[in-house]
Amino acid sequence: MSGLHKQFLKKIKEQERAFGLSSLSEDPDESESNSNYFSPTPQPPNELRTDINEERHGHIRETYNDTKRDVFPIADIYTDPRSGVRFQTYFKPPSSSNAPIFICHHGAGSSSMTFCKLAQSLDNEYGKNNEYPGLFTYDMRGHGDSSTTIPPDYSLATITNDCEFIIDEFHAKHALRSSIYLLGHSLGGSVLTSYLVANPDNAYKFKGLIVLDIVEETAIKALSAMPQFVRKRPTTFGDYQEAIDWHIKESHLLHSEESALVSVPDLLRECPNGLIWKTNLQETEPFWETWFTGLSENFINCGKTQHIAKLLVLSGHETLDTNLIIGQMQGKYQLIVFNNTQNTGHFIQEDIPTQISISLVDFVRRNDSPNEYMKKEFGFVPKWGGKIHD
């Protein structure tokens, strides 16, 4: 470990402890870190089961559909005239224009419902004058209930263009006056960062960029394990419970069954004798090398025109590259690390939605209302540039 990295770790220990979170490890195990991303323990391919528990299967389906409708009352299709791709979107409006809106982008192989429990937790944690934030999300092309092109194109440039279309369309459909925070998990964080780089002078009211559990160097190294994982993951499941059990008990991709009851069914399509994946991850392989290259530098430098605040939230002890270390020490972004490997994995928004919500609400309040935040947290509002009286 470099001296710069040690100095960095020492600096943030007190900051993270003060926030009630686990600190970065001083001697991270790089191989363990990489496994958090894309390389859960591969399992032998499943044969299609015929012993479906129809009652259990139907109950999970009903819970999934009811929860999705309750959390996201607005579910629209946005069709991009340039590509013909139909994007499934979900929107939970804020209580008023005084509450923020989170625009969320999921990662590869995931879907919008990875943010469902987070949306519920944000309502519980925001709790200011009976207000609650909004949350908008959409299924990336070829994921969830969105379509894709033939031949498929999952390059970062293309899915960034998709993101630009979605955000423009979202603003056109809704008279937005709330402050907006962009929130991306894994590949979604790279897409939103790329969007800000490509649109430095946009007129939207972006206040912050939040990236969940992605570090450029670690992600690029972890991609080497993806082909084996994609080949060896089950191709079919007998019912929803079997799929949930695989995500939690076998692959350890997820750690919360409550969240998995909504997020996992959204990944699967029912066929006559079971369930198959909606997303063909093998089709994305030719584009993997485009996804994360330059992410750290772009994250540090994007959004300067709008003075966009930035937050990086990690599930465990990642080895940060020099750009991220220097950027954090210079105060260019806030870093939060959750280091409880028994309860958290790569999908931290699903595993610990309450803790993530607390972190997001704190980030929003210090950026939306800094004077009010300082007064509440520290009992005073600093008068920068004024005289200090004894």
Curated annotation (Swiss-Prot):
E.C. no: 3.1.1.89
Domain AB hydrolase-1: 100-332
UniProt enzyme class: hydrolase
Superkingdom classification of source: Eukaryota
Region (Disordered): 19-50
Keywords linked to the UniProt accession: Hydrolase, Serine esterase
Cellular component GO terms, alphabetical: mitochondrial small ribosomal subunit
GO molecular function terms noted in the UniProt entry: protein C-terminal methylesterase activity
Active site positions, chain numbering: 186, 213, 346
Catalytic reactions of this protein: [phosphatase 2A protein]-C-terminal L-leucine methyl ester + H2O = [phosphatase 2A protein]-C-terminal L-leucine + methanol + H(+)
Role according to the record: Demethylates proteins that have been reversibly carboxymethylated. Demethylates the phosphatase PP2A catalytic subunit.
Family: Belongs to the AB hydrolase superfamily.
Alphabetical list of PANTHER family matching this protein: PROTEIN PHOSPHATASE METHYLESTERASE 1 (PTHR14189:SF0), PROTEIN PHOSPHATASE METHYLESTERASE-1 RELATED (PTHR14189)
Name of the protein in question: Protein phosphatase methylesterase 1
